[in-house]
């Protein structure tokens, strides 16, 4: 008799995706992040669901309801901080996953890569609207500043901003709709992730060498299920360490002050995972220019398959490209640091240089270096 997992319509899908999936035998731990992102998403949806049971999306009670969750709900503080720090873990995994894709040339799978870019945008939108919900000072002013950027759009900007706000300022209508968006978007992410996986399984996984591995495949289970469990344990350990020992390490103290439209915080800044983009935005003195730079700093990822000029897929055997890749990582870390600093000398200058380097590396240096490496191969 044939095994049920190979005949049952539902089990067959699970089997082909997670059990009998032919996988390259040489993929490293950098390939763990996909499954970790799935785990993060499920964890965020579950903790978010329990938080939504006690949260009230109203300007007068939102801040108090979060306090109530932390003080009065059984283990509410654990759920709240798991959710807040879970978002940080989510973005750490996203950036590692993207870095892996860039380094090993996973962008050759166009559809998978492009859906990944859409997933990134959706996740960033979810995190942004979620940060507004506790209705602290940074929530309120973050929402005001970021939504206000849309007013830089010529002709329709101001109307668009007021339409998003649902009034003439960030108020009750804004909070209610942001809660609605924050609830629905993770399920859209879930659907997109399924499509992401669907396209990936059309081609099969890439591997560190970037060379087709069809002649050397092993089943996903037990080899990679066991390997993924190690990543899962490390992720859970890190998340629990953060949540139970230093739950506010990555947060902003200003968000423990209830939102007050009459008093602006000294330094308005987003969560750490948006600081690199925020630094690029701030480094351009023109409002519209800054908004376009901010948008393009993420959209540039969609251009990466077109900017790939090397004859080799992976960077494994390309030392010059490897060097530039790590310069890019260092540059992004510099931008993240600058984004959290006040707008004053020397931070402004460092931010401008780092922003120029970011675009210069991706658009010019890396493609040109790849062409030079192609020439060197003929020597």
From Swiss-Prot:
Q: What is this protein called?
A: Cytochrome b
Subcellular location, record wording: Mitochondrion inner membrane
Binding residues for heme b b566: 97, 196
Assembly and partners are described as: The cytochrome bc1 complex contains 11 subunits: 3 respiratory subunits (MT-CYB, CYC1 and UQCRFS1), 2 core proteins (UQCRC1 and UQCRC2) and 6 low-molecular weight proteins (UQCRH/QCR6, UQCRB/QCR7, UQCRQ/QCR8, UQCR10/QCR9, UQCR11/QCR10 and a cleavage product of UQCRFS1). This cytochrome bc1 complex then forms a dimer.
- Cofactor comment in the record? Binds 2 heme b groups non-covalently.
Q: Which PROSITE patterns match?
A: CYTB_CTER, CYTB_NTER
Q: Which organism is it from?
A: Caperea marginata (Pigmy right whale)
**InterPro entries noted in UniProt:** Cyt_b/b6_C (IPR005798), Cyt_b/b6_C_sf (IPR036150), Cyt_b/b6_N (IPR005797), Cytb/b6-like_sf (IPR027387), Cytochrome_b (IPR030689), Cytochrome_b_C_euk/bac (IPR048260), Cytochrome_b_N_euk/bac (IPR048259), Di-haem_cyt_TM (IPR016174)
Q: Where are the transmembrane segments?
A: 33-53, 77-98, 113-133, 178-198, 226-246, 288-308, 320-340, 347-367
Family note:
Belongs to the cytochrome b family.
Annotated membrane topology is: Multi-pass membrane protein
Q: Which UniProt keywords apply?
A: Electron transport, Heme, Iron, Membrane, Metal-binding, Mitochondrion, Mitochondrion inner membrane, Respiratory chain, Transmembrane, Transmembrane helix, Transport, Ubiquinone
* GO CC annotations, alphabetized: mitochondrial inner membrane; respiratory chain complex III
- Residues bound to heme b b562: 83, 182
A GO MF term: metal ion binding
Annotated GO biological processes are:
mitochondrial electron transport, ubiquinol to cytochrome c
Binding of a ubiquinone: at which residues?
A: 201
Q: Show the taxonomic lineage.
A: Eukaryota, Metazoa, Chordata, Craniata, Vertebrata
Its biological purpose is as follows: Component of the ubiquinol-cytochrome c reductase complex (complex III or cytochrome b-c1 complex) that is part of the mitochondrial respiratory chain. The b-c1 complex mediates electron transfer from ubiquinol to cytochrome c. Contributes to the generation of a proton gradient across the mitochondrial membrane that is then used for ATP synthesis.
Please tell me whether the keyword Disulfide bond is annotated for this protein: no
First-listed, main subcellular location of the protein, grouped into a coarse class: mitochondrion
The further comment given in this record reads: Heme 1 (or BL or b562) is low-potential and absorbs at about 562 nm, and heme 2 (or BH or b566) is high-potential and absorbs at about 566 nm.
Q: Which cofactors are reported in the record for this sequence?
A: heme b
């Amino acid at each position: 008799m044939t095994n049920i997992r190979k005949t049952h319509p539902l089990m067959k899908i699970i089997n082909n995706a997670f059990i009998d999936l032919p996988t390259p035998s040489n993929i490293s731990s950098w390939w763990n992040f996909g499954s970790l992102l799935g785990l993060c998403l499920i964890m965020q949806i579950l903790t978010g669901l329990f938080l939504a049971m006690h949260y009230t999306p109203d300007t007068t009670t939102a801040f108090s309801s979060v306090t109530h969750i932390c003080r009065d709900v059984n283990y509410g503080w654990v759920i709240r901080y798991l959710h807040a720090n879970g978002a940080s873990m989510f973005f750490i995994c996203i950036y590692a996953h993207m870095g892996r894709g860039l380094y090993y040339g996973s962008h050759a799978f166009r559809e998978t890569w492009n859906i990944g870019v859409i997933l990134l945008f959706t996740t960033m939108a979810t995190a942004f609207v979620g940060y507004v919900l506790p209705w602290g000072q940074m929530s309120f002013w973050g929402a005001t500043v970021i939504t206000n950027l849309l007013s830089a759009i010529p002709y329709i900007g101001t109307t668009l901003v007021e339409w998003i706000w649902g009034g003439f300022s960030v108020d009750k209508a804004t909070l209610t709709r942001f809660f609605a968006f924050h609830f629905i978007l993770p399920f859209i992410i879930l659907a997109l992730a399924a499509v992401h996986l669907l396209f990936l399984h059309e081609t099969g996984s890439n591997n560190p060498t970037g060379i087709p591995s069809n002649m050397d495949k092993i089943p996903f289970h037990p080899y990679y299920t066991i390997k993924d469990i190690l990543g899962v344990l490390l992720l859970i350990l890190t998340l629990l360490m953060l949540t139970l020992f230093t739950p506010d390490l990555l947060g902003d103290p200003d968000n423990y002050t209830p939102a007050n439209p009459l008093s602006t915080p000294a330094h308005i800044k987003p969560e750490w995972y948006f600081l690199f983009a925020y630094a690029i935005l701030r480094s351009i003195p023109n409002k519209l220019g800054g908004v376009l730079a901010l948008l393009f700093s993420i959209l540039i990822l969609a251009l990466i398959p077109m900017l790939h000029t090397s004859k080799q897929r992976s960077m494994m055997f390309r030392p010059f490209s490897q060097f530039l890749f790590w310069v890019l990582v260092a540059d992004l870390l510099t931008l993240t640091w600058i984004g959290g600093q006040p707008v004053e000398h020397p931070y402004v200058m460092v931010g401008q240089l780092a922003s120029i380097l970011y675009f210069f590396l991706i658009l010019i240096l890396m493609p040109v270096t790849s062409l030079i490496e192609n020439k060197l191969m003929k020597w």
